[in-house]
């Protein structure tokens, strides 16, 4: 029996292919079924402004610091209200069991900034669209709101909005969701309408792009000794596989690093504020600007660069021991970025 060597493979195969994300706007593939007692959107979109540190009272009963003030790193998300410009009705396709859109309703009067991304019809017959909704109301299985961000209300300095499709949930009755979607047409939704301070959320965003990188930085491969017998290189793998098969994709190779869509589960939402001046540094957030209106404080870090769109949703795999449901007591928030 020789020495047992534990050498895990370098990098995760669960995130292949390691290529650039198709779109900088995150694509959410899974939405949870939550019971909120009232219909509501299951997600929200905001812009990453930067990071600060805050003094928060530890409210975990099993913590040795329970009831004491602790310092935590927090991410600031600029969260202007989302504009609801329409909704879609889905039913199950009898041939394959997949969801299929059968009706779509737009708001009667759309704001000017939507002309940058939507080609609006000259005559919009909303009553005709609503009749189609009533036609499929009994067989509908899902209702999703069509929302647009309002970057002109943020500190980014751009005007073109992003379009997203966010499901409406919170109640099991699809009929209630349809009525709620109709009531939202042409209105805005703020973060407080979707989340409550203290709850857990999933964060979905496209990470920072690093460009073309080698195996040392991309996979954490061990640097080979720098002596004469390693004359073919040091910042490389010892082998790229056998003679056959010709290419083993499981072997670490150089290539694109970063700009991948990633999901981080169960981040705690510490605070939802209305006045961004409370937490904006005197000179503004570096490489971002000034948070003017509503904002969200997330405990810990969030994927992506500053100004990047981040999608928050209700947790799809909440832990068995969830944190206290009460709103955390944020004693102080710094005015200096990390």
From Swiss-Prot:
What Pfam families does its record include? Ribosomal_L3 (PF00297)
Q: Where are the annotated segments for Disordered?
A: 230-258
**InterPro entries for this protein:** L3_arc_euk, Ribosomal_L3_dom_3_arc_sf, Ribosomal_uL3, Ribosomal_uL3_arc, Ribosomal_uL3_CS, Transl_B-barrel_sf
UniProt keywords (A-Z) are:
Ribonucleoprotein, Ribosomal protein, RNA-binding, rRNA-binding
What are the annotated disulfide bridges?
none
Q: Give coiled-coil spans as residue ranges.
A: none
PROSITE patterns the UniProt entry points to = RIBOSOMAL_L3 (PS00474)
What biological processes does GO assign it?
A: translation
Do you know which SUPFAM superfamilies this protein is assigned to? Translation proteins (SSF50447)
Q: Name one GO molecular function term.
A: structural constituent of ribosome
List all membrane-crossing ranges: none
Q: Which GO terms describe its cellular component?
A: cytosolic large ribosomal subunit
Q: Which family does it belong to?
A: Belongs to the universal ribosomal protein uL3 family.
| Its job | One of the primary rRNA binding proteins, it binds directly near the 3'-end of the 23S rRNA, where it nucleates assembly of the 50S subunit.
The subunit field of the Swiss-Prot or TrEMBL record says: Part of the 50S ribosomal subunit. Forms a cluster with proteins L14 and L24e.
In its UniProt entry, what is this protein called? Large ribosomal subunit protein uL3
Q: Which organism is it from?
A: Pyrobaculum aerophilum (strain ATCC 51768 / DSM 7523 / JCM 9630 / CIP 104966 / NBRC 100827 / IM2)
Traced from the root, the source organism's taxonomic lineage reads:
Archaea, Thermoproteota, Thermoprotei, Thermoproteales, Thermoproteaceae
């Amino acid at each position: 029996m020789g020495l047992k060597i534990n050498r895990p493979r370098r990098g995760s195969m669960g995130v292949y292919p390691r290529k650039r994300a198709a779109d900088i706007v995150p694509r959410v593939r899974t939405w949870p079924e939550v019971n909120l007692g009232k219909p509501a959107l299951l997600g929200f979109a905001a812009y990453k402004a930067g990071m600060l540190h805050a003094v928060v009272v530890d409210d975990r009963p099993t913590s040795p610091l329970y009831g004491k003030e602790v310092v935590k790193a927090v991410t600031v998300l600029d969260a202007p209200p989302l504009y609801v410009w329409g909704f879609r009705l889905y039913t199950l396709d009898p041939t394959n069991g997949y969801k299929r859109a059968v009706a779509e309703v737009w708001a009667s009067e759309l704001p000017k900034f939507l002309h940058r991304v939507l080609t609006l019809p000259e005559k919009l017959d909303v009553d005709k669209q609503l009749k189609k909704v009533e036609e499929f109301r009994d067989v509908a299985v899902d209702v999703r709101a069509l929302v647009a961000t309002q970057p002109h209300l943020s500190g980014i300095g751009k005007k073109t909005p992003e379009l997203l499709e966010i499901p409406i949930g919170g109640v099991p009755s699809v009929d209630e969701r349809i009525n709620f979607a109709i009531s939202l047409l042409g209105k805005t939704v703020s973060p407080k309408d979707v989340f409550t301070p203290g709850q857990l959320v999933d964060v979905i965003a496209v990470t920072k792009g690093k460009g073309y990188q080698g195996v040392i930085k991309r996979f954490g491969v061990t640097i080979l000794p720098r002596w004469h017998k390693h004359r073919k290189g040091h910042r490389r793998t010892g082998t790229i596989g056998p003679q056959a098969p010709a290419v083993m994709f499981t072997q670490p190779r150089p290539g694109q690093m970063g700009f991948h869509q990633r999901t981080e589960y169960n981040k705690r939402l510490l605070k939802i504020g209305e006045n961004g001046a409370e937490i904006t540094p005197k000179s503004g957030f570096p490489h971002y600007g000034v948070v003017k209106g509503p904002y969200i404080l997330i405990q810990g870090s969030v994927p992506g660069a500053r100004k990047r769109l981040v999608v928050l949703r209700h947790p799809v795999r909440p832990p068995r021991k969830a944190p206290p449901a009460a709103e955390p007591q944020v004693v102080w928030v710094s005015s200096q970025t990390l």
